[in-house]
Amino acid sequence: FNSYLITLSNLNSKTIIALKKEGVTGMSVLMPEMKLSKQLANNNVPDYIWVGNKWELYIEGLPSIDWNRLQNFFKNLEIDLLGPQFEGVRILISPEKVMDLAKHPMITYIQQKEAPAIPENKIGIKNHRSNALRVPYAGGRNYDGDGIVVGHGDDGDIQPHIDFSGRVLANKSGPSNGAHGDHVAGTIMGAGNLDPDGEGQAPGSKLVYYDYPDNLNDIDTDYGLYGIRVTASSYSNGCNAGYTSFTRRVDLDAIQHPSLTHVFSAGNNGNSNCNYGAGSGWGNITGGHKQGKNVIATANVTGSDIIAGSSSRGPAHDGRIKPDIAALGTNVFSCLAPNDYRSITGTSMACPGIAGVLAQLYDAYRQNNNGVDPEGGLMRALLTNNADDLGNPGPDFKYGYGRVNGLRAAKAIEMNWFIKDTIAQNETDTIDIPV
């Protein structure tokens, strides 16, 4: 079953009969309280939304809404319009006037502002089978991510490092706030020029570097401008935040930019209770955007494929499988400025491992398909369905579909072991698969 939000200028028995003929099985009026996020509806709001004596909220309206025509309505409720965001606008409003806002027929959704961002922090390339993909000599695959551009959002300016030389297409960040971004960037695309043990997953790939979350906010422009096909974000966005406006935004990116894949860390709250309902240790993925249906959230495993105690567990807020995949995130050896290296642990280090392997797989697809880009949905399917199963049989809430196996995914690309097809309601489609 699918749900839709519709507007009707005239609801009568004739309209209801017509809708039933189209297969509509039920309808309800969108009441004001139904427009509120769970936190607002339960009056369980986080401290960070307070600005003076008002709340900072995000609101959406019907597609036909003209926010400028609501100026008088906003003025009567003493609402401050802060500016556009995603598909709606940000506002400041007194808590007691939120329900009055929700009663407006053009308003469809109201939620608290997004949670503030907090960074999450030679075995990897072997465990991920990344090394087998990029052998450059005769008979090797040579999938090193050449020509693939990764949009990496992190903690401010990455410092000069010999491992990045000539492959940072643009640095759109502000001043440096630490070494987190340097280490993550090295795990994605470090060349290992000074120390081969510090080589990243895709040493042929290129980087566009941002202050997080501008790698997500700017994708509508930079997908075409720089050719970004993979993003990497090792930042939290609230704990078990549910399906937020930011989640919807990154899911829409997959539709509007079909060859794009967003990669996130799952989070480092593995022992936390984030009010999912199963107690400590479950339902603590650190973010709304990580819970998207068209994105990858990455768990942290050790070099012996054991889930790290700190690695956030699923399920998603609505019960879906999260994390999606696991990668080495414990004692990852990577770049540190200036021209240095260090081992760091966290899902922050697992996320770039997946982003780097994806860059290699995009490279593999191009090399085997006359330079054509794959669809992001196919790459996510290849990544998860070719993982090495860990933990409980099948996908689970600790490891997702298992630890990434880049070699197996690349072989599926080379052998064309995938089918794209469509089917309509009540139709039958038969596909023969040789075994």
What are these regions (language model features)?
Residues 68, 133-217, 226-229, 240-243, ...:
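Subtilisin-like serine protease catalytic core
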